[in-house]
Amino acid sequence: MTNIRKSHPLTKIINSSFIDLPTPSSISSWWNFGSLLGICLAVQILTGLFLAMHYTADTSTAFNSVTHICRDVNYGWVLRYMHANGASMFFICLYLHVGRGLYYGSYTYTETWNVGIMLLFAVMATAFMGYVLPWGQMSFWGATVITNLLSAIPYIGTNLVEWIWGGFSVDKATLTRFFAFHFILPFIISAMVMVHLLFLHETGSNNPTGIPSNMDMIPFHPYHTIKDILGLLLMLTALLVLVMFSPDLLGDPDNYTPANPLNTPPHIKPEWYFLFAYAILRSIPNKLGGVLALILSILILAIIPLLHTSKQRSMMFRPISQCMFWLLVADMLTLTWIGGQPVEHPYIIIGQLASILYFSIILIFMPLASLTENHLLKW
């Protein structure tokens, strides 16, 4: 008799995706982040669902409802801080996942890569709208500043901003619709994750060498499930340490002040995971130019497969490209630091130089490094 795992229509899908899936034997811990992102998404949906049971999306009660969750709901503070810091974990895993894709040439699976970019945009949109919901000072002013960027679009800009706001400023209508979108988007993301996995399983996983590994495959379970569980335990430990010991480490103190349209905070800045893009936005003096640079800083990932000039897929054996990659990582960390600093000398010029370097590395230096390596290897 055939094992029910392999014959039943439902378990067959699970079996071919997570149990008997042929996986390269050489994949390292850098391949753990996909499963960690899945866990992050599940944690965010669960904690978010329970938070939504107590939260009220109304300008007069939103801030107090969050306070009520933290003070009066049983373990409400755990839910709230797991959700807030879970978002930070989500983005740490996301950036490491994208970085691994860049380093090992996983972007040559173009469908998987492009769905991944759409997922990145969707997660960023969800996180931005979630940050508005507690209705603190940074929530209100962050929403005002970021939505106002759309007014830079010629001709339709102002009408578009007022349409998104549902009025002439960020108010009750804005908060209500942001809550609705923040609630529905994670489920859309879940569906997109299925598509991401569907495309991935069409080609199979890449591996550190970048060489096809069809000759050397092992089943996903138990070998990689055990490895993923180790990664999960490490991530959950980090998350719980953050939640239990310093839950506000990554937050902004201004968000503990209720939103006040008459009082602007001295430094308006988004959460840490958007600071690199925010620094690129601020480094261009023109509003429309800044908005375009902001969008392109993420959208540039879509043209990376076209910029792949190397004869090798992975950077494992390409030292010049490795230098360029780590220079890009250092540049992104610099941009993240600059995004959190006030707009004054010397931060302005550092931000502008780092922004130019960011686009230069991806568009010019990396393809040139690959061509140089091809030439050195007489290819």
From Swiss-Prot:
Query: One MF term from GO for this chain?
Result: metal ion binding
Task: Supply any other comment.
Answer: Heme 1 (or BL or b562) is low-potential and absorbs at about 562 nm, and heme 2 (or BH or b566) is high-potential and absorbs at about 566 nm.
Q: Which cofactor does it need?
A: heme b
Q: What is this protein called?
A: Cytochrome b
Query: Transmembrane ranges?
Result: 33-53, 77-98, 113-133, 178-198, 226-246, 288-308, 320-340, 347-367
One Pfam family, please name it. Cytochrom_B_C
One GO cellular component, as annotated: respiratory chain complex III
Q: Which organism is it from?
A: Natalus major (Hispaniolan funnel-eared bat)
* GO biological processes: mitochondrial electron transport, ubiquinol to cytochrome c
Alphabetized, the UniProt keywords read:
Electron transport, Heme, Iron, Membrane, Metal-binding, Mitochondrion, Mitochondrion inner membrane, Respiratory chain, Transmembrane, Transmembrane helix, Transport, Ubiquinone
Q: How does it assemble?
A: The cytochrome bc1 complex contains 11 subunits: 3 respiratory subunits (MT-CYB, CYC1 and UQCRFS1), 2 core proteins (UQCRC1 and UQCRC2) and 6 low-molecular weight proteins (UQCRH/QCR6, UQCRB/QCR7, UQCRQ/QCR8, UQCR10/QCR9, UQCR11/QCR10 and a cleavage product of UQCRFS1). This cytochrome bc1 complex then forms a dimer.
| UniProt-annotated location(s) | Mitochondrion inner membrane
Q: Give the co-factor note.
A: Binds 2 heme b groups non-covalently.
In what way does this protein cross or attach to the membrane?
Multi-pass membrane protein
- In which domain of life is the source organism classified? Eukaryota
Its biological purpose: Component of the ubiquinol-cytochrome c reductase complex (complex III or cytochrome b-c1 complex) that is part of the mitochondrial respiratory chain. The b-c1 complex mediates electron transfer from ubiquinol to cytochrome c. Contributes to the generation of a proton gradient across the mitochondrial membrane that is then used for ATP synthesis.
Q: Where does heme b b562 bind?
A: H83, H182
Concerning its family, UniProt says: Belongs to the cytochrome b family.
Q: Where does a ubiquinone bind?
A: H201
